A protein has these predicted regions:
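Non-catalytic C-terminal accessory region of glycerolipid acyltransferases
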Residues: 1-15, 106-250
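A transmembrane-helix-recognition feature enriched in membrane-embedded lipid enzymes
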Residues: 10-30, 67-72, 85-93
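Helix-to-loop junction immediately C-terminal to a conserved catalytic motif
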Residues: 19-50
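Short gly/ser/thr-rich secondary-structure transition/capping motifs
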Residues: 25-32, 96-99, 187-188
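Sequence-level motif detector for i,i+2 pairs with an aromatic at +2
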Residues: 27, 41, 70, 112, ...
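Residues in well-ordered beta-strands of folded domains
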Residues: 33, 47, 76, 118, ...
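Catalytic core of membrane glycerolipid acyltransferases/transacylases, capturing the structured
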Residues: 40-104, 109-110, 121-138
């Protein structure tokens, strides 16, 4: 019987999906820089930009950090994804946990794990193509409070290429969830279009860790830190875009 940790993750390393690993290497051709900024031990909150219908960015970061830096990554996801039959258990198996302050604190502070969050939330994946690579507001700074309370550093990870794999052209809303309608959906149809991604070259840059331990947790200070981190990531992303010669070849 497969062994799992208390979060439901398979304990024999990240379960391997051959097709996804092949896509990581040969389809998206993911390249990293700044991996020395990933802490070798202890908890850390990884913060990244977010994009696309059925976004692969989370899985790419999880797989990449484990392959390149040797540490597993737990990802926090909206509770709505766990409402579908069997999906929740499958997500848990690959290290995805319901996004909740208590879960984040236990992973970071008690278990000293790397935890990945996307502060843009749904605003990232559902933004129009005209806003491509413009980072949306980082909520109310909840991720900053999470890192402060867990006494761990924040490590920004900037992804370039993910928004070209599934360009958003519209969106629909179901309850409190919003779903992007992508160009892939239009070309490949409602089912295949959710999974077929264009072969954009993806680059990931890990920025220097940000230590906020001991800082004031007042709302205004938290919001200032969140905006400062968003601005730093946007600047890095702008630099990466400026250097890029082709969205398909990097």
């Amino acid at each position: 019987m497969e062994k799992r940790d208390r979060w439901g993750r398979a304990t024999e390393g990240t379960p391997k999906i051959a097709l996804f690993e092949a896509a990581y290497r040969s389809w998206f051709r993911v390249e990293w820089e700044g991996l020395e900024n990933i802490p070798e031990e202890g908890g850390a909150l990884l913060v990244s930009n977010h994009a696309g219908m059925m976004p692969v960015d989370g899985g790419l970061v999880q797989l990449g950090v484990e392959k390149e830096a040797g540490r597993p990554v737990y990802m926090l996801a909206h509770h709505g994804f766990f409402a579908f039959p069997y999906v929740g258990r499958l997500l848990n198996r690959f290290g995805t946990v319901v996004a909740h302050p208590n879960n984040a604190h236990r992973l970071l502070h008690e278990d000293e794990r790397l935890v990945l969050v996307f502060p843009e939330g749904e605003k990232g994946p559902v933004k129009p193509t005209s806003e491509r690579y413009r980072l949306q507001r980082f909520g109310r700074g909840g991720f900053v409070e999470t890192a402060m309370r867990a006494q761990v550093p924040i490590v920004p990870i900037v992804l370039m290429g993910t928004e070209d794999t599934t360009p958003t052209i519209a969106r629909i809303s179901v309850g409190d969830l919003h779903y992007p309608i992508t160009l892939n959906f239009v070309i490949f149809g409602p089912i295949l279009g959710q999974f077929a991604h264009f072969p954009a070259k993806i680059r990931a840059r890990v920025l220097s860790p940000i230590d906020l331990v001991g800082r004031s947790e007042s709302r205004s200070v938290v919001m200032d830190h969140a905006e400062s981190i968003r601005s730093e990531m946007q600047t890095a992303l702008d630099e990466m875009i400026a250097r890029r010669e082709s969205r398909w070849f990097g």
